Curated annotation (Swiss-Prot):
One cellular-component annotation, GO: cytosol
Localization of this protein: Cytoplasm
Coiled coil start-end: none
HAMAP family listed in its UniProt record: FdeH (MF_00611)
GO molecular function terms listed in the Swiss-Prot or TrEMBL record: ferric iron binding
Signal peptide: none
Family per record: Belongs to the FdhE family.
GO BP, sorted A to Z: protein maturation
Organism encoding this protein: Shigella flexneri
Pfam families assigned to the protein according to its UniProt record, in alphabetical order: FdhE_C (PF24860), FdhE_central (PF24859), FdhE_N (PF04216)
The name this protein goes by in its record: Protein FdhE homolog
């Protein structure tokens, strides 16, 4: 199965009714997203060996919240949705959609917000980004979207991605239309922008018990059935790993068919779990999975592979 976004005027009345039964997509709810993430990162930093880095990530998430309200985005995506729907492509495809200079405006605003909070190497990094040319910034963005991580240092990548993510999340929040599940391929990528997930979550509330993958760029969540590999869609050789016990709120789902794993967060076991924060705070589980020979099928926006990884 794949997910395609259909313009409102192309949906029949029956589709408009059934589209809400099991929502294929959950668009980002930006009002509380960054504040909730920052709070969760700070909470997880307590008694965590990665505490300093989690607090650093919390500063970026808080800055995203501030910049979101200071620099709103106005854009009519109706034509883009129609074109993408006709082509069967993600409407905000990172490999196709031209980048507006708005994202660089967001980056400069993030840097201005973060500067008073930074010191040492981190301050040097954002000052270096502040001095970079427009083309240099575009080249780094293109490299990240192409997974050419050797071209962007791992200390610059989180800041570049934070601005790109904010821009794409703003666009995703403006999408007019409904999502429809169809047969297709590449379900492991975000149907809105084509980026990778950061983790998956089994939710509570109106989507009780359903698993959604969380996009590491546009913050959209898309439905993928449980007990099926989110990377290759096979189901015969899945294993579940945790550092605590079978009732752990964070597990890794590994697949022996493709040799990858993705974390699953369970809201029913810990309602506070957050897709980015809890993934970042559980790197010990990633180390265990690497020891077992599995490759991660996702990327955390605060932790990019370095050169040679």
């Amino acid at each position: 199965m794949s997910i395609r976004i259909i313009p409102q005027d192309e949906l029949g009345s029956s589709e408009k009714r059934t589209a809400d039964m099991i929502p294929p997509l959950l668009f980002p709810r930006l009002k509380n997203l960054y504040n909730r993430r920052a709070e969760r990162l700070r909470e997880l930093a307590e008694n965590n060996p990665l505490g300093d880095y989690l607090r650093f990530a919390a500063l970026i998430a808080h800055a995203q919240k501030v910049v979101l309200y200071d620099h709103p985005l106005e854009m009519d995506l109706t034509a883009r949705i129609k074109e993408a729907s006709a082509q069967g492509k993600p409407p905000l495809d990172i490999h196709v959609l031209p980048r507006d200079k708005h994202w660089q405006k967001l980056l400069m605003a993030l840097i201005a917000e973060l500067k008073p909070e930074m010191s040492g190497p981190a301050l040097a990094v954002i000052e270096n980004l502040e001095k970079a040319s427009t083309q240099e910034l575009e080249d780094m963005a293109s490299a990240l979207f192409a997974s050419d991580f050797s071209s962007v240092s791992s200390d610059k990548a989180p800041f570049i991605w934070a601005a790109l993510s904010l821009y794409w999340a703003q666009m995703a929040n403006l999408i007019p239309g409904k999502a429809r599940a169809e047969y297709g391929e590449q379900r492991q990528y975000c149907p809105v922008c084509g980026s990778m997930p950061v983790s998956s979550m089994v939710q509570i509330g109106t989507t009780q018990g359903l698993r959604y993958l969380h996009c590491n760029l546009c913050e959209t969540e898309w439905h993928v059935v449980r007990v099926k590999c989110s990377n290759c869609e096979q189901s015969g050789k899945l294993h579940y790993w945790s550092l605590d016990d079978e009732q752990a709120a964070i597990k890794a789902e590994s697949c022996d068919d493709c040799g990858t794993y993705l974390k699953i967060l369970y809201q029913e076991k810990e309602p506070k779990v957050e897709a980015v924060a809890d993934d970042l705070a559980s790197l010990v589980l990633d180390a265990r999975m690497e020891q077992e020979g599995y490759a991660r099928s996702s990327i955390n926006p605060f932790l990019f592979p370095g050169e040679g990884e």
